[in-house]
Amino acid sequence: MASELDGLPVIATRREEAEGFLQGLVSKSLGWARKYSLFTYPFVTACCGMEYMTMASARYDSDRFGAAMPRFSPRQADLLMVVGTVNCKQAPILQRVYEQMADPKWVMAFGVCASSGGFYDNYATVQGIDRVIPVDVYVPGCPPRPEQVLDGIMLLQKKIQNQSHKLIDRKPLPVISGGAGR
């Protein structure tokens, strides 16, 4: 015997399914919001810094992609842009900067030197920052053109939007009842 509801889509039948559906919607909303609000922290060490300044200028307008003005503290940033060569003495500093960033955090290797050590193949140069910290996007070039950097930002935005964004489970605070006759 067919009922009137046959053929209609059912969103959720149990409470757990409804919570999963709601968390999925919230996760997609957070992904959309986070992809357009990247707070960058530039770790500039070499000549690619000139191209970074060009990319951040009004001509290329990185603000329209959500990567606005750079932050002056890694604690305020969620995108670490490693610009240029990193030597072995700077590697612990870079790792400390990465650890100071709050989650979620992403890393962009800006240029060939940050990606693979560039033409500095010697004992003092880190042959790619992925040996020190995890990297999300590699931007090639020596130095990379601003268009390539903006393309890397758009690739990172796609990655951010497709990630699952978990909500923080906050337990309720305990209720402290005070007696009236203390």
Swiss-Prot record:
InterPro entries: NADH_UbQ_OxRdtase-like_20kDa, NADH_UQ_OxRdtase_20Kd_su. [4Fe-4S] cluster binds at residues 47-48, 113, 142. It catalyses: a quinone + NADH + 5 H(+)(in) = a quinol + NAD(+) + 4 H(+)(out). Binds 1 [4Fe-4S] cluster. This is NADH-quinone oxidoreductase subunit B 2. It comes from Anaeromyxobacter sp. (strain K). Keywords: 4Fe-4S, Cell inner membrane, Cell membrane, Iron, Iron-sulfur, Membrane, Metal-binding, NAD, Quinone, Translocase, Transport, Ubiquinone. It is a peripheral membrane protein. The keyword Membrane applies. GO terms for biological process: aerobic respiration; electron transport coupled proton transport. GO terms for cellular component: plasma membrane; respiratory chain complex I. Gene3D superfamilies: 3.40.50.12280. Its cofactor is [4Fe-4S] cluster. One of its GO terms (molecular function) is iron ion binding.
